[in-house]
Amino acid sequence: MSRVTLSRYLIEQTRSHNTPADLRFLIEVVARACKEISHAVSKGALGGVLGSMGTENVQGEVQKKLDVMSNEILLEANEWAGNLAGMASEEMDHPYQIPGRYPKGAYLLVFDPLDGSSNIDVNVSVGTIFSVLRCPSEYLNQNDTLREEAFLQPGTTQVAAGYAIYGPQTMLMLTLGNGVKGFTLDRELGSFVLTHDNISVPESTAEFAINMSNQRHWEAPVKRYVEELLAGKEGPLGKNYNMRWIASMVADVHRILTRGGVFMYPRDAREPEKPGKLRLMYEANPMSFIIEQAGGAATNGTQRILDIKPENLHQRVAVFLGSKQEVERITGYHAE
């Protein structure tokens, strides 16, 4: 049986689910950019790409060389193709305007070019997260500057989302709103090949991911839930749990997609004015879309993440996602 490449899969989606051709082309361009980023990441010190730039992004985070390089790769790959009205990135304060010499399209691309980049120098898996939105018709004028408001849509309006993980293998996980597929990069073929079909997150789990060093700063519902997990078989949940924490959202979520679990990045008391650490538009929304399409759940503790109406491009949010039973349990604790 012949292997199904990403291109073939997308063509078949156009035939069977009426996936628009311009969306198919957009996903293929993003995938090509991810292959280029994967190559740069794999070279490491040999490519002179490790270390920091000595600059900060809009989040106040020190930019790694590969952060900036990955951002440029995604911008340059997508700006000319005619599929996009604009782009937004973790690494840029404002939306990226499609240069006037190129045609504009109907979609918006939002991305974290290199999630987990603090792990680059220690050779831990990192990745690229992306979300595709339709550009509202009122912002489609070819001559106008695209405003931030065009991007401020709830996660339910996403038409596609995915992430590439750069680890022992490079994989692309993708949803077009009808389930989640996993593609592995065949370096000899030069293509992403379908290797994981109809991915499903188990409803219950015996694993959880959270940064335990922040325990003293958590809100009461989170403390209660984690204490119950740690109590094991003798505790109220009646089974033993293992903790896993990689400190790379892509790597932690990828593990949950493949074998179940719950990922938690709660708000804490150190910065009470902030609703969380992770960014809604280009981290929480695409990952929540993927997790829900795989049968899991995602909330901020009180509300479904995909229902949140963004107030700004770099809005932060608390995140609890993964196996449905566990996410519903901790959401219930927040409601008490």
Curated annotation (Swiss-Prot):
Residues that hold Mg(2+) 1 according to the record: 90, 112, 114
Binding site for substrate: 115-118, 211, 277
Annotated localization: Cytoplasm
Gene3D superfamilies reported for this sequence: 3.40.190.80, Fructose-1,6-Bisphosphatase, subunit A, domain 1 (3.30.540.10)
Annotated EC: 3.1.3.11
Any single Pfam family the record assigns to this protein: FBPase
Entry GO CC: cytosol
Catalytically driven reaction(s): beta-D-fructose 1,6-bisphosphate + H2O = beta-D-fructose 6-phosphate + phosphate
SUPFAM superfamilies tied to this protein: Carbohydrate phosphatase
Quaternary structure (record): Homotetramer.
Annotated HAMAP family: FBPase_class1 (MF_01855)
Protein name: Fructose-1,6-bisphosphatase class 1
Gene source species: Pseudomonas aeruginosa (strain UCBPP-PA14)
Taxonomy of the source species: Bacteria, Pseudomonadati, Pseudomonadota, Gammaproteobacteria, Pseudomonadales
